[in-house]
Amino acid sequence: MKKRLLLIVVLLLKGMSSLEAETNVMKWKPYGFVRNFFCYDSRKSLRSSGEMFNMIPLDRDLNKYGDDLNQTGDVSFLAITSRLGINVSGMQFMNADLSGKIEADFNGFSGSTTMLRLRQAFMQLKWQHSRVVIGQTWHPITEYVTPDVFSLASGSPFNPFSRSPQVRYDYEWKRFICTAAALYQFQYTSPGPEGYSAEYAKNAIVPELFFSTAYSHQDITLGFGVDYLELRPRTTSLDNQNVKVKVSDRVRSISPI
């Protein structure tokens, strides 16, 4: 997290130091909220974020007497999704509006202790019809199709949900917007031989690639896109002589959206 915060600060300072006869009035706007989230579940479910983000109820787990062991309820009452953030704006660089955001909550778990967790940390260069985003923010598909709702987990597991380090380019033409992005994994990771981990994507070297085109008018948004993901689940294995050797196994997927 410290490396990502440092990267954003360096990029912002670099942009500021390169200003030549351009407007340089930095504006800081803090924001945030306190959320005390109470939830009652009548059944055991697949959950995350301190068991507050409910994704899907677990299937029946019957014992020999026919009792469903997952048919039991529980409650959660936590404030860890309270949020703090700062928006930075008011600068110009390369004839573009330069802005940035740093956002965190308290949903970083270490055992039974919660810690400050990085949600977003990025800079943005915005021209009249295009923009470049560098840093950790919402996955491109999530930004345009996720409604603002009160509940923490509304729409899961069908609602796309991911914040990732990325380099993204958006171009707007009339009511259309075209997006190209290269993304890396951080918190939201892929499953593999050692469980969920970002190592499989890191070992593959190639970033996740995303391309899309969308049409938006008033309350209607229509679009299509494609997402390419390449993973390298392992880098070594044992041969017939029980000697550890290098392997180049890869898993590739193309997902139309």
Task: Please give the residue ranges for each predicted region.
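Outer membrane beta-barrel
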Residues: 23-50, 60-188, 205-206, 210, ...
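Solvent-exposed, glycine/polar-rich loop segments of beta-barrel outer-membrane systems
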Residues: 48-58, 237-245
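N-terminal secretory signal peptides that target proteins for export/translocation
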Residues: 1-2
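Sec-dependent N-terminal signal peptides
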Residues: 5-13
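Extracellular loop and loop/strand-boundary signature of outer-membrane beta-barrel proteins
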Residues: 69-72, 107, 150-155, 190-199, ...
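A short secondary-structure junction signal
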Residues: 145-146, 181, 189-194, 225, ...
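Detector for outer-membrane/organellar transmembrane beta-barrel domains
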Residues: 218-257
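Cleavable N-terminal signal peptides
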Residues: 8, 18-19
